[in-house]
Each structure stands twice: as C-alpha cells, then as structure tokens.
Amino acid sequence: MSITMSDSAAQRVQAFMNNRGKGLGLRLGVRTSGCSGMAYVLEFVDDMNDDDIVFENKGVKVIIDGKSLVYLDGTELDFVKEGLNEGFKFNNPNVSSECGCGESFNV
C-alpha cells in the first residue's frame, strides 16, 4: 500500500506547512459527494486518530484514515499549473469514472 507525491506537490505542501507554522502533516481522504459518488478531502493534521495510517514521501507526512485507504491506495498527489489555474491533482489508479466537471469520482 502506498501514497506518493510529485516533487511539485511536496514543495507546495511544505510551503503551506511552513506558512501555517504547525501541524503533523496533510490528511488525504474521501467523502461522499458529487454526481459520481466520492470527492477528495485535503486538510492539515494537528492530531492523529487511532485508525490513521502515515505515509512519508519527500519529507511530507500524508495521513489517511483506514476507510479512505481502500479508495486511495496507489494514488499520487501532484500539483499542476495550467494557464492561470493551479491546484492539486490526484492520479488515482482505482478510479473507474469521473463526473464531467471533475469534482467527484467512482471506483
């Protein structure tokens, strides 16, 4: 089981963590949402939960709850710039379909 991140994603997360000044790492999870069923959740972690699993990659701790790991195993977190837009992109090999707007997915 693994979660990885690109160099650009690691640099961006580290910059956010440094600006924030505290935190253990970044939580990656899923929630029920959108027309395809699930959406990604990214948030800072200050306290660990009992079922959390930690993946450290490029100096960044990515923290995932046990229930989300089933949907996220093998995912690479990337940070991309396209024109004036920039943001995190999830390269998830488990995704079977995505909604037209790209906000949600199904496995």
From Swiss-Prot:
Cofactor or coenzyme needed: Fe cation
An annotated GO cellular component: cytosol
GO biological process: iron-sulfur cluster assembly
Entry coiled-coil feature ranges: none
Pfam families registered for this protein in UniProt: Fe-S_biosyn
Cofactor comment: Binds 2 iron ions per dimer. The dimer may bind additional iron ions.
Alphabetical keyword list: Iron, Metal-binding
Binding positions for Fe cation per the UniProt entry: C35, C99, C101
MF annotations from Gene Ontology: 2 iron, 2 sulfur cluster binding; iron ion binding
Recorded family membership: Belongs to the HesB/IscA family.
Subunit structure: Homodimer; may form tetramers and higher multimers.
Task performed by this protein: Is able to transfer iron-sulfur clusters to apo-ferredoxin. Multiple cycles of [2Fe2S] cluster formation and transfer are observed, suggesting that IscA acts catalytically. Recruits intracellular free iron so as to provide iron for the assembly of transient iron-sulfur cluster in IscU in the presence of IscS, L-cysteine and the thioredoxin reductase system TrxA/TrxB.
Protein name: Iron-binding protein IscA
Organism of origin: Serratia proteamaculans (strain 568)
Native organism taxonomy: Bacteria, Pseudomonadati, Pseudomonadota, Gammaproteobacteria, Enterobacterales
